[in-house]
């Protein structure tokens, strides 16, 4: 039997099973011992899951891991302020982006709702590889035109041919240039695609995927280092599969963002420990393209030294099984943290985690106190424990997610940055 590889774990709480004992966790400990690389944090709003997710990200920042958080609502962005509260300070980079520098290293908030983010995630600009550009374009189009009636196989082939031609002749290709070409195509069915994309380019979040004509700028974030938190405040969050145009655009943007973050992390040397955190993960997993992306990180992450942390309100939202509910990559799970939820969802978690049914785990989960950080933790061996996650009160004060508090923090950071 191989020796256990020891890692620099962090105290995250205490076990409530019998005698209280300390509980340690590290996002890379499982894969360091040939286990899975995926940790999940699930529970209803106010249950403590976001608090626990932030605590793990802070611990990884202290350990100088490269951490990239995707957080549509912006809850995780408070880590940048915590870095200041811990003794750091606000700074601005050459582009005027505000970040904090302190005990957690550099913590940067990439606000995709800001006016400066127009064209920041143009799928034709994120990689110089033709295969990547076409993969991104196909995935984005399939999410936006998901009914299959508008984007038929023949129409897709024509669109891709126009895209290939643009990539051949344009030194700075963009989705904007492609959209103009499609809008004037002789085929009416192709023009419909172009006109729809043109309308999307005028929306608050759609414009993030369309680089302005004449722009030669690279993405604002061109490499992963320190802690980066991408936010999309105000984005439409579908409860399940996106049902309207606004939700489809939001999910398409999130897919492009997640693809790009994976691209940046996989480019880093394997010796660098990397943590990818996706909050509201159901927005990614509810589409086939996003699910495939998550599966790829779960499969390939161990060889690239990437730990994947998924947070969502329901465990069933982020199951790693295939479309039929079986197979998939369930063995990629390293740890599961289940906070308070309703009894039906709790029963689903008990089954998915392989816990014995009929022993009251579902009732216990449903009765956990809200906001206290109480959860059931299942480790890579399938061993469960009810724990109270410990977060210092000073951190909790900063982690508050009240919208007015968040706006006040952003204003204060802007005034203090040098």
Predicted regions: what they are:
Residues 47-121:
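Walker A/P-loop NTP-binding active-site region of P-loop NTPases
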Residues 95-104, 219-222, 327-331:
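Short, conserved catalytic or adaptor-binding loops enriched in Gly and charged residues
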Residues 24, 108-111, 229-231, 338:
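Structural signal for conserved beta-strand scaffold positions within catalytic alpha/beta enzyme cores
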Residues 29-47, 51-59, 68-77, 113, ...:
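Conserved P-loop NTPase motor cores
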Residues 2-22, 72-74, 81-86, 114-306, ...:
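P-loop NTPase motor domains
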Residues 124-173, 177, 322-418:
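P-loop NTPase motor core of the ASCE superfamily
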Residues 1-42, 394, 417:
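Basic- and hydrophobic-enriched, low-structure N-terminal and domain-boundary segments
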């Amino acid at each position: 039997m191989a020796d256990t590889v020891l890692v620099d774990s962090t105290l995250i709480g205490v076990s409530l099973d019998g005698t209280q004992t300390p509980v340690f966790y590290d996002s890379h400990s499982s894969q360091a011992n040939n286990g899975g690389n995926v940790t999940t944090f699930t529970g209803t709003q106010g249950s403590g899951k976001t608090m626990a997710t932030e605590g793990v990200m802070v611990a990884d920042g202290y350990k100088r891991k490269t951490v990239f958080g995707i957080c549509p609502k912006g809850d995780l962005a408070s880590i940048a302020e915590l870095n200041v509260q811990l003794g750091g300070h606000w700074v601005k980079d050459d582009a005027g982006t505000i970040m904090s520098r302190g005990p957690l290293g550099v913590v940067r908030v990439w606000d995709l709702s800001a006016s400066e983010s127009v064209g920041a995630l143009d799928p034709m600009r994120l990689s110089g590889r033709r295969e990547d550009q076409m993969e991104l374009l196909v995935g984005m189009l399939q999410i936006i035109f998901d009914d299959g009636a508008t984007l038929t196989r023949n129409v897709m082939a024509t669109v891709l041919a126009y895209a290939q031609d643009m990539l051949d002749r344009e030194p700075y290709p963009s989705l904007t240039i492609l959209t103009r070409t499609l809008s004037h195509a002789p085929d009416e069915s192709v023009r419909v695609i172009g006109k729809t994309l043109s309308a999307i380019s005028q929306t608050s979040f759609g414009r993030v995927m369309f680089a302005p004509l004449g722009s030669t700028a690279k993405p604002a974030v061109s490499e992963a280092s320190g802690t980066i938190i991408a936010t999309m405040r105000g984005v439409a969050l579908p409860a399940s599969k996106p049902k309207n145009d606004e939700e489809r655009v939001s999910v398409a943007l999130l897919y492009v963002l997640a693809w790009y973050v994976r691209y940046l992390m996989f480019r880093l040397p394997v010796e660098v420990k990397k943590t990818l955190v996706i909050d509201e993960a159901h927005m990614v997993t509810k589409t086939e393209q996003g699910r495939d992306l998550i599966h790829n990180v779960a499969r390939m992450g161990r060889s690239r030294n990437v730990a994947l942390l998924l947070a969502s309100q329901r465990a069933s939202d982020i199951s790693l099984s295939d479309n039929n509910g079986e197979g998939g990559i369930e063995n990629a799970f390293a740890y599961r943290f289940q906070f308070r939820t309703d009894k039906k969802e709790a029963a689903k978690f008990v089954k998915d985690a392989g816990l014995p049914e009929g022993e009251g785990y579902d009732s216990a989960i449903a009765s956990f106190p809200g906001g206290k950080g109480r959860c059931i933790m299942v480790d890579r061996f399938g061993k469960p424990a009810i724990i109270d996650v410990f977060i210092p009160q000073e951190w909790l004060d900063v982690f508050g997610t009240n919208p007015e508090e968040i706006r006040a923090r952003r204003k204060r950071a802007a005034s203090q940055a040098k």
